[in-house]
Amino acid sequence: MVRVARSVNARKKRRSILAAAKGYRGQRSRLYRKAKEQVLRSLVYAYRDRRKRKSNFRKLWIIRINAAARMEGVTYNRFLQGLKLANIELDRRSLAHLAVHNPDTFSALVGVAKDSLKNAPDPVAAARLRGTSSRT
C-alpha cells in the first residue's frame, strides 16, 4: 500500500495561517497553534464589526444632525418631526453631510422644519377634541 504524504498540504495550510497572523504580537505571529486561534478570533471580530459599522455610522450622523440643529435652536427630534410634517424625505446620511459641508442649506431646512411645526395642529389638543387620550 502506498503511503499518503500530507506534508505539502499541511505546510501550505500552516504557511497561510502564519501569513494571516503577520503583524500580531508575540507568539501569535510565530507559533502555529496560537496564530490559528488568533486568526479565527480575528475573523469573528471582522464579521461582527462589519455589521457594527453600520450602527456606528448611524449614531455619528444623528450626533452631527443634533449638534447642527441645536445651533439653530431646535432639537434633533423636533427637527425630524418638522421635516416629516413638511414632507421632506432626506435620510440621516444626507442630513449629516449637509450639516457639516453646507451649513446654509441645513439652516434653510431647519427653517422649513420650524415653519411646519408652527403650522401643524397640536396632537394633544386634537385628541382632547375627539374625547380620546393621545397617551395609552
Swiss-Prot record:
GO MF terms, alphabetically ordered: rRNA binding; structural constituent of ribosome
GO cellular component: ribonucleoprotein complex; ribosome
Biological processes annotated in GO: ribosomal large subunit assembly; translation
Annotated keywords: Ribonucleoprotein, Ribosomal protein, RNA-binding, rRNA-binding
SUPFAM superfamilies: Ribosomal protein L20
Short name of one Pfam family: Ribosomal_L20
Functional note: Binds directly to 23S ribosomal RNA and is necessary for the in vitro assembly process of the 50S ribosomal subunit. It is not involved in the protein synthesizing functions of that subunit.
Similarity comment text for this entry: Belongs to the bacterial ribosomal protein bL20 family.
Protein name: Large ribosomal subunit protein bL20
Organism, as annotated: Tropheryma whipplei (strain Twist)
